[in-house]
């Protein structure tokens, strides 16, 4: 992103770090439960649910709208995962998921304020 709001938008780096940390926690939890983790870019592509945007560079406003929509969708996926954890009495993963839901809702709020501000 470029322009007069570059510094404000640079705060999105914090969101990227949160998401990266979340993926690390997910992989660690999967391994603790005896599961497999993603092994390659192809593996990621085959399992991803949020669509990539491979178009030409979008304007900043459109990018923020897309990020907000992605976070809203991720919140729904996390809530579904939490329900699954509850059904299987997996308290530890449910607890992690609660934190991730909170972080995702916070990112959505931040993006909404930036978009509407």
Feature-to-residue mapping (PLM):
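Acidic/histidine-rich alpha-helical segments that form the ligand environment
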Residues: 24, 28, 45-99
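Residue-identity detector for glycine
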Residues: 3, 34-35, 55, 76, ...
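Long, contiguous binding/interaction regions
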Residues: 5, 17, 36-48, 65-73, ...
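Short, flexible helix-adjacent loops and helix caps
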Residues: 1-5, 83, 87-90, 116
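Conserved alpha-helical segments that form or flank metal/cofactor-binding pockets of metalloenzymes
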Residues: 1, 6-43
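Amphipathic alpha-helical coiled-coil segments
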Residues: 25-27, 107-115
